[in-house]
Curated annotation (Swiss-Prot):
<dbReference type="InterPro" id="IPR050164">
    <property type="entry name" value="Peptidase_C19"/>
</dbReference>
<feature type="compositionally biased region" description="Basic and acidic residues">
    <location>
        <begin position="473"/>
        <end position="486"/>
    </location>
</feature>
<dbReference type="InterPro" id="IPR001394">
    <property type="entry name" value="Peptidase_C19_UCH"/>
</dbReference>
<keyword id="KW-0645">Protease</keyword>
<feature type="region of interest" description="Disordered">
    <location>
        <begin position="374"/>
        <end position="394"/>
    </location>
</feature>
<keyword id="KW-0378">Hydrolase</keyword>
<comment type="function">
    <text>Deubiquitinating enzyme that removes conjugated ubiquitin from specific proteins to regulate different cellular processes. Has deubiquitinating enzyme activity for DNAH5, suggesting a role in the regulation of DNAH5 degradation by the ubiquitin-proteasome pathway. Has growth-suppressing activity; induces arrest in G1 phase upon controlled expression.</text>
</comment>
<dbReference type="GO" id="GO:0006508">
    <property type="term" value="P:proteolysis"/>
</dbReference>
<dbReference type="InterPro" id="IPR038765">
    <property type="entry name" value="Papain-like_cys_pep_sf"/>
</dbReference>
<feature type="compositionally biased region" description="Basic residues">
    <location>
        <begin position="374"/>
        <end position="385"/>
    </location>
</feature>
<dbReference type="GO" id="GO:0106222">
    <property type="term" value="F:lncRNA binding"/>
</dbReference>
<keyword id="KW-0832">Ubl conjugation</keyword>
<dbReference type="GO" id="GO:0016579">
    <property type="term" value="P:protein deubiquitination"/>
</dbReference>
<feature type="domain" description="USP">
    <location>
        <begin position="51"/>
        <end position="348"/>
    </location>
</feature>
<comment type="similarity">
    <text>Belongs to the peptidase C19 family.</text>
</comment>
<feature type="region of interest" description="Disordered">
    <location>
        <begin position="1"/>
        <end position="21"/>
    </location>
</feature>
<dbReference type="InterPro" id="IPR018200">
    <property type="entry name" value="USP_CS"/>
</dbReference>
Amino acid sequence: MVVALSFPEADPALSSPDAPELHQDEAQVVEELTVNGKHSLSWESPQGPGCGLQNTGNSCYLNAALQCLTHTPPLADYMLSQEHSQTCCSPEGCKLCAMEALVTQSLLHSHSGDVMKPSHILTSAFHKHQQEDAHEFLMFTLETMHESCLQVHRQSKPTSEDSSPIHDIFGGWWRSQIKCLLCQGTSDTYDRFLDIPLDISSAQSVKQALWDTEKSEELCGDNAYYCGKCRQKMPASKTLHVHIAPKVLMVVLNRFSAFTGNKLDRKVSYPEFLDLKPYLSEPTGGPLPYALYAVLVHDGATSHSGHYFCCVKAGHGKWYKMDDTKVTRCDVTSVLNENAYVLFYVQQANLKQVSIDMPEGRINEVLDPEYQLKKSRRKKHKKKSPFTEDLGEPCENRDKRAIKETSLGKGKVLQEVNHKKAGQKHGNTKLMPQKQNHQKAGQNLRNTEVELDLPADAIVIHQPRSTANWGRDSPDKENQPLHNADRLLTSQGPVNTWQLCRQEGRRRSKKGQNKNKQGQRLLLVC
């Protein structure tokens, strides 16, 4: 599906570089962002993966989309805080309350092997028991949750603007700039976005597609720009940049034709860590790193057929493949090899957990082109013997290292003195062979004489043992709905009806009756 970005036609009065309206519009954007920044947007505690979701018939697309939202760190923490449901006036039909119940039940009150059935409130307005586009359902769900937030905000603050935690988490701002090629006057317009659609028809990677999005478009001929300063239509250039980056970056790879629904099934590489700074309208300061936490995948030939699943990164840092009711471990290598449809990135600055945070040294390694050169220089420096003075080394480098150097000759003297004292103490002055003495002297010097003071920006990373790649499940056909669930739960707890209690009493005599044949419990979130 191709998403068209439309921008308001530029006001000719704004073509002058010093037009005051331009700065006022930008100030409003910054002010709104500042107001929205009051929400806590990070994992407050490490969470494991959520439970699987029941396929009610061609519902794999909404299951995959809901799993990606459930494992969005800022959104999950907002849902777990119960902030909205405590003030909502109509929770029985509120989509945000339904999403809050789904996330809470999935992350906090489920066990391994449990299966949940998404609430009818979340799915009824969109799902018609046929295959749909997962990205369209994502945008529909975000907008309906945004409207639910606005209803509460307008009741408490009638004068509040159209801002919500949903836009605070996923919302960013485009800056569309038109520049007159004669007088160099510019006109800027700002528009909010919740996702970034990318044309991948000629791109080999997400980074290349991002660069293609920002290519300058020439406005000439019938499409020429009316310059307010020149007072006539003039050739101009139009550029599109991210002006304010979102906290959660949702990148959509346009794989489906808007007319036929046919899929562009080509490999497009995407990184685990992405620096958005080069794509900003004003790229100042340090890197703006994002970490991948979810990948939504479509396996099929058209948007009306095939199967959807996703890979998500849980709060404790491990990756899982969420395929309807099946939840299986996977590694980041297999995740990066998927034929992705929608990518989810989160700003590193908004994550607190070490298991998710990328260490500063890792950020530099991925984002800074000069880091590899610096790293190789440090490796060469570490290979030098601490017993040999490097007289050709600059003084400032020796000062930085702050290593107390000892020559090989001094090492021999210390060795002989130490062994002589030891021999006198035990009544034996016999010295060890010279080869062994060299080794022991080196050990003593390393333990007592050599002091290594790492620089302030040095980082020590202990790599875990590599594990074997987890097997990847081949995409299956649509899963059939589960039947004969042994235990039905809602977001408020067990369903205490006479029939269920009677059935439960009959089953208690059998061992393990709290699970079905697949070892799964069906949880109903109402």
